[in-house]
Regions:
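Active-site-proximal beta-strand/loop segments in catalytic clefts of secreted hydrolases
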Residues: 49-51, 56-58, 63-67, 79, ...
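Extracellular/periplasmic catalytic domains that process cell-envelope and extracellular macromolecules
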Residues: 37-41, 55, 93-97, 122-126, ...
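Chymotrypsin/trypsin-fold serine protease catalytic domain
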Residues: 96-175, 198-221
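Conserved hydrophobic/aromatic beta-strand scaffold that supports enzyme active sites
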Residues: 45, 60-62, 100-104, 145-147, ...
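Short conserved beta-strand and strand-loop elements enriched in small hydrophobics
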Residues: 46, 72-83, 128-135
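Catalytic histidine site
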Residues: 38-75, 87-95, 197-199
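Secretory targeting and sorting signals
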Residues: 1-28
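C-terminal subregion of chymotrypsin/trypsin-like serine protease catalytic domains
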Residues: 2-4, 56-65, 175-176, 180-250
Length: 250
């Protein structure tokens, strides 16, 4: 396996449950492999606000709350497994609990991916293994990824008692700045976003998105988009145009 970095930038430490040490700012993931051209999950991973995020519909990015202010601050957006695409975002929304945010694309902008990842609606279980993706915010030319095993589930008072969990990398990887908000996919479903990590040999902490599925649905409904919960994501603009008769009904 080639030695590269994955990246986990962090604005604040996370206080973990009794059996876990409090974690300071994330320090990037090393020893991770670059993704292959046929990695279907990698194509939706983006760089936004100096952190990692995931395009979950044509107009919305799932990311980490601590990377963004809550409001209309614009952020540069890079897409593609070699970060060749450039766009912009318009507004960020914070989940009521957990280190979770949704970032809306700029007006008249939209992703054009063939598909969008399915979101997990159940919390992960200890022992499950998933694939983590994250961008270092400076050096990587190609998106890195790593295998990680779920260990402990806990609730974090720093994020209104939000549901969190820890994972241990199985391939010697560990975090570096830029990975915050990076997705962990378990059985092909987006299960969590990276929140905090402290370095080599220590667990990575993720926000459990299943705890905020209803908030995600309600927030995305602002422009008619719907998350993929097993039936594919819905483009709110296309839905509106179909209702108006400008596009054929599906």
């Amino acid at each position: 396996m080639s030695i590269n970095k994955i990246a986990l930038s962090l604005a604040a430490a996370v206080t973990v449950a009794t059996s876990i040490i409090a974690t300071p700012s994330a320090q990037a993931v090393q020893n991770a492999a670059p993704v292959s051209d046929d990695d279907a999950l990698a194509k939706n991973v983006v760089i936004v606000g100096g952190c990692t995020g995931t395009a979950i519909s044509p107009h919305w990015i799932l990311a980490a709350k601590h990377c963004f202010g809550n409001g209309t601050t614009a952020h540069m957006l890079h897409t593609g497994v070699e970060k060749t695409g450039v766009d912009g975002t318009e507004e960020a929304y914070h989940a009521p609990t957990g280190d979770i945010a949704l970032v809306r694309m700029s007006t008249h902008s939209a992703f054009t991916f063939d598909s969008y990842p399915e979101l997990a609606t159940e919390e992960p279980k200890s022992g499950q293994v998933g694939t983590f993706y994250g961008w270092d915010n400076t050096s990587h030319k190609r998106l890195p990824h790593s295998q990680a095993e779920v260990k402990n589930l806990y609730q974090n008072g720093s994020y209104n008692n939000g549901k969190m969990y820890t994972v241990h990398h199985k391939d010697g990887a560990y975090a570096q700045p830029g990975d915050s908000g990076g997705p962990l996919f378990i059985d092909g479903k987006l299960s969590g976003v990276a929140s905090a990590i402290s370095g080599n040999g220590t667990p990575m902490n993720l926000a459990d998105i299943s705890a905020e599925i209803n908030w995600i649905k309600q927030t995305m409904a602002r422009n008619g988009d719907e998350p993929n919960l097993g039936n594919g994501a819905v483009n709110g603009m296309d839905k509106l145009l179909r209702l108006k008769g400008f596009l054929p009904r599906a």
